[in-house]
């Protein structure tokens, strides 16, 4: 089937280009120089397609660039791709690499052929249809050229749609009936649009440019409102919308991954209204219409009806997901339908009569071949853990800048790497996702939890124990891209308060810092030993600290961060009935982070049973003693408190006793820096 479709495409393209050359010769031979030069100028946009084809050949690593350049200068670059695809389909068996190579060649050929048809065949079709209609259907050469251009442009759209199905994982082979139905759909819609524009241009001349420009602007704004994510760059995204808006003057192409029923219906409804208005204006509301104009009106209406009927038949009967489309349409029209079956069975896969449909496992191998063959084949040493980060980044950048990456985004109708990975890796259990799509350091960082149970100290008697908290696992990638989790760590507590804040995602440069912070936590947490000693009271004290994990600093053993705690105050657990903990031994603080600020907890107040100290002054004297200690000032780094205009929002409520102590603590904050 591949060879037959490629042969049909080549035959149709050869006939269309031959008729184009014959029409140019015909115009110059009959003295119609204006039409001859206009038909000749239509060939100029083809050089853009040839230049793009040559660049793609170079990106694929083809040798003999000098003769490739000559072929493309002679407008034969697309023909070279036709020859390569037919040769691959006929002479190279059905091995997985051969099928993968054939799919890549067909993808390149379909994309370039569609671009060539839109830039060359579309304008040539409008020109030849106008000449044929202006001659009252008497000039045979422009009529034949217009007919072949019409068929060639329609087949280019069908081939592009088939290419989209080939590039998708677990694709279904299209039957000949589906291809024929798509051809009728495209020919009907294109014929109605071209005839209405040509008939209006025949009467109002240049005003057809106003109609086309207005339609272009409306379609461009509609595309902007749809927010396609195929192109990431802002400048390229705007250019993409402008170009697709120009394409929508003649035909519709889907660039969105969501269901397109409403978009297709809206587009063709607008086209029907525009065509009807243009016909009514061109024929003076069907009063005194000549015979040629009347036949043109009949052709427009019949073409639109044939296109609509073919469109409905294709999506209801011949589409690979036709059963799902029917069920969705019935649910939308008639509400939910009760089914006796517990689960809806998937639609049967369309089987080609020749039996050339690859199964899902073979397709996974082909897709893996397609994407991994874009760069150099990795050596056995590179498959081990010794692969450097620089090599991964270079392979990533080379793949993301390759033209096959653009074709893959067009096929899956999305530019999101996570969605492309999910589509390629979730097709079947045995499908091996290409490593280049899954080796993004940024994605790995998002999927990696910030803390694990092994990294945190787990001793229940440690004075500064970081209890096992909730890990950030199972979070969707879309949420992890916009959310960053900061932990509020409790001393001598079994609870960990997590607050989720809206922050930009961590960059790739911050990932070594995160890894270093985790290593410091694991190493220093094991060294921290020694129980706290104190008395059990009715009221307990819990100290909360906020750690900004995106700005961690490496901790040096030579300059430990010491937490000075008064012996007269007890740090006990918030739960009632907890036995008294022994006295704490001064040890290095296991969490070495910058910008640590004390956050008062629910029970953060001095103990009522502490003798020899007033309840209102115990906390103030403790911090003042820490500030006056010269040995502590020389050995500890100074860490400023956060500014008053930048409060730290926490999920920890504040008790009424804390508010009574604010005046004393505010005076301390103005006199000293905070030491840990």
Swiss-Prot record:
SS bonds (residue pairs) = none
Source domain of life: Eukaryota
Pfam families in the record: XK-related
Q: How does it sit in the membrane?
A: Multi-pass membrane protein
Which residues span the membrane? 37-57, 114-134, 140-160, 206-226, 239-259, 266-286, 294-314
- Residue ranges annotated as compositionally biased, kind Polar residues, are 498-509
Annotated compartments: Cell membrane
Q: Which UniProt keywords apply?
A: Cell membrane, Membrane, Transmembrane, Transmembrane helix
Where does the record place the region Disordered?
A: 336-362, 372-391, 495-538, 598-661
Q: Name one GO cellular component term.
A: plasma membrane
Question: Which family does the entry's similarity section mention?
Answer: Belongs to the XK family.
Protein name per UniProt: XK-related protein 5
> What's the name of its gene?
Xkr5
